[in-house]
Each structure stands twice: as structure tokens, then as C-alpha cells.
Amino acid sequence: VRHTATYIPPVAARSFAYLGVTAHEALATGNPALQSLAGQLTDLKPLPARGSGDFDEPCVIHAALAAMVETLFSNTGPTGQRAMVKMSEIMGRTASAGIAEDVVNRSVAHGQAVAAHVLAWAAADGGAKIDNMGFPQEYT
């Protein structure tokens, strides 16, 4: 956030809220004890269901959050960009260590689908486009 232009507190809070929703939904699709937020949060439609086969939860959540961070913080400076890439590589490698390749691929694809769904939902909230460096056009 520190290196991301336009990230005043409301903009940062919005991004962190969407990261939380994404993390919850990524796990809720594979855990019947967790209730999806679809239908509870305004206009959030049911998320993509998991297909058949095994999934690895760390790989699912890593892929979902990595996709969200890449999009939500895309306008960060060079230092932030390098940090995001490095962290994603380390976390991806750690999450997938010892997991069968087909399970990793299926899990990553599902995590990315969850992120895409949440990002599409977020695009309609009125806060996706940041003008005037994140400050209101008219300020009194």
C-alpha cells in the first residue's frame, strides 16, 4: 500500500475487504462448514463450484489472493511490483511443495476463477475506477 499511488485509506480499505471476501470464498467452496457470502453481500452471485478431483487448500487460496493482489495493486511502484512478484513466487512454491501437479493445476485454476468472480463483482461497486488521485472531485 505504501508504494501504491492513489491508495488513500478508503481505497486501501476497499482492497483489503475484497481480499478478505476472496479468501473466505476460496475456502468456502471446498468446506461445507463455511457458508458462502453470496446472497449475503449485495449483488454477490454464487461463486464457481469446484470440479471433480482433489484440491489443495493452500494452492487454492494462494492462487486466489495472488490474482487479487496483482489486480488490486497493479498501479504500485517498481518496489511494490518486485515485492509482489517475489512473494507470489515464494508462496506458490511453498504451497505446492509435495503436491501432485494435477492437484496443483486444478487448485490454481479454481483459485483464479474465484478471484475473477470477485473482481467482476467488485468492478460494479463504484470504487473500481480511481480518479483525482483517490480524492473526491469536490472537497469542502
Describe the function of each predicted region:
Residues V1-T140:
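Acidic/polar surface patches and capping/hinge elements
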